[in-house]
Curated annotation (Swiss-Prot):
Source organism: Ralstonia nicotianae (strain ATCC BAA-1114 / GMI1000)
Keyword GTP-binding: no
Name of the featured protein: Trigger factor
GO biological-process terms attached to the record: 'de novo' cotranslational protein folding; cell division; chaperone-mediated protein folding; protein transport; protein unfolding
Gene Ontology CC terms: cytoplasm
InterPro entries: PPIase_dom_sf, PPIase_FKBP_dom, Trig_fac, Trigger_fac_C, Trigger_fac_C_sf, Trigger_fac_ribosome-bd_bac, Trigger_fac_ribosome-bd_sf, Trigger_fact/SurA_dom_sf
Length: 449
């Protein structure tokens, strides 16, 4: 049989393989002999099953395995000898016509990696975001940290934690209510609750509901109409008007911690220094700015590379990546607590576009790295790990954690190499700086998902 690799198209190839039947039979008998030592059958002790019975039970299955194993081994020997870079997995089809009596023949069809051409990057226009952390941003962060440590105390009570006034619901208060809603006098699903709590002003409830609750005294009730929006998530009530009765059972005011030494210590500042606290917050925000601005620039660089790149993308690699994305989605759903995820059908087609971009980008990046001899230097990897470790309580332990596992180290090496590609493209392209506030930066990142 010829071992000439046939060209079927841009990336598609075919090679015909011949496997001697004698070799298959010899390997089949060898595997059955090994299997007979452990196989279990009713009426026989393990290892004492007659060979004829083992062959009758497992012979056909073992023979098929041997055929394809030998075909696969021959396939990879041929492609390696001829320097062919196989993309994805080959598909083997057993031939039935034009085959010698003493052979099994297979047609192996497969794809090869494409030639990748990277065009001129000089015309690419990129924007490098510049964001400065101001004292106002630090103050906002401190406010957020205070709200995360809020304590609620009953309104209308005296004492250290009482406000001494009336128990009247105000904006920012945490309220506990009973409510019941009806449409045309009939209660509806989800329209009734007892002991339901929420914070006024956070927007968790519809505006009309919050407005009706504001100003209520503890123990007081109110009847009011509420028009559900047409796009409301509850389809049974969307676009309809309900009548609600709400009763205020409890109202609590928010007590935010004071900005003092104790507050600073709660944030990990051992000596309670407010200056150190602010410096620490600034450092964390600047680290976040660096991460976000780099992500924005990296996205632009990847888009620029895809625009100037010319290549055909192997379908087999796209299909493999679709399956990876399906499994990633399944693990994500499991992590979120969704039941029966293993049996849930997740169509791979929904990831087709994403998978094609990922595969194409991977091929383009590999070509840029190879042609321009880019590499992740040990000192770059070390610096990146140390920078990452700074955000943890025990940086030295994080550094040991990275260097203690080759897989984690390889992931960091890939990250550094990708950064080097970004820097390489920026050196070739036209890059303009653009000022952006921290609020705008976080909003931009949020919009991108």
């Amino acid at each position: 049989m010829s071992t000439v690799i046939e060209n079927l198209g841009k990336l598609d190839r075919k090679v015909t393989l011949a496997v001697p039947k004698a070799e298959v039979e010899q390997e089949k008998q060898s595997r059955l002999a090994r299997l007979s030592k452990t196989v279990k059958m009713s009426g026989f002790r393990p290892g004492k099953v007659p060979m004829k019975m083992v062959e009758k039970q497992y012979g056909q299955q073992v023979e098929m395995e041997v055929r394809f194993d030998k075909a696969a081994r021959q396939f990879f020997d041929i492609t390696n000898e001829q320097g062919v870079k196989v993309a994805g997995q080959p598909r083997f089809e057993l031939k039935s016509e034009g085959v010698a009596d003493d052979q099994f023949a297979f047609d192996a069809t497969f794809e090869v990696y494409p030639e990748v051409k990277i065009g001129d990057l000089a015309g690419a226009e990129l924007t490098r975001t510049k964001t400065e952390i101001t004292d106002a941003e630090i103050d906002k962060t401190i406010d957020i940290l205070r709200k995360q440590r809020v304590h609620y105390h009953p309104r209308g009570e005296a004492g250290d934690h009482g406000d001494g006034g009336e128990a009247v619901a105000q904006n920012g208060d945490r309220v506990t209510v009973d409510f019941v809603g009806t449409i045309d006098g009939v209660e509806f699903a989800g329209g009734k609750a007892e002991g339901f709590g929420f914070v006024l002003g956070e927007g968790r409830m519809l505006p009309e509901f919050e407005q009706a609750t504001l100003g209520l005294k503890q123990g007081e009730s109110k009847v009011f109409p509420l028009a559900f929006p047409a796009d409301y998530h509850g389809k049974d009530v969307a676009g309809k008007t309900a009548e609600f009765t709400v009763t205020l059972k409890q109202v609590e005011w928010a007590h935010l911690p004071e900005i003092n030494g104790a507050f600073a210590q709660s944030l990990g500042i051992a000596d309670g220094s407010l200056d150190k606290m602010r410096a620490d917050i600034r450092e964390n925000l600047e680290r976040e700015v660096k991460r976000r601005t780099h992500a924005l620039l990296k996205d632009q660089v990847m888009d620029a590379l895809l625009k100037v790149a010319e290549l055909d993308v192997p379908k087999s690699l796209i299909e493999q990546d679709q399956e990876r994305l399906v499994e990633m989605a399944r693990r994500d759903l499991e992590a979120r607590g969704m039941p029966n995820v293993k049996n849930m059908p997740i169509p791979a087609e929904m990831f087709a576009q994403q998978a094609e971009r990922r595969v194409k980008l991977g091929l383009v990046l590999a070509e840029v790295v190879k042609v321009n001899a880019l590499e992740a230097k040990p000192e770059q990897i070390k610096a990146e790990i140390e920078e990452f470790a700074k955000s943890y309580e025990d940086p030295k332990e994080v550094i040991r954690w990275y260097y203690g596992d080759q897989q984690r180290l390889a992931e960091m090496e890939a990250y550094v190499l990708e950064n080097n590609v970004v820097n390489f493209v920026c050196d070739k392209a036209k890059v303009a700086d653009k000022a952006m506030s921290f609020e705008e930066l976080t909003a931009t990142q949020g919009a991108q998902g």
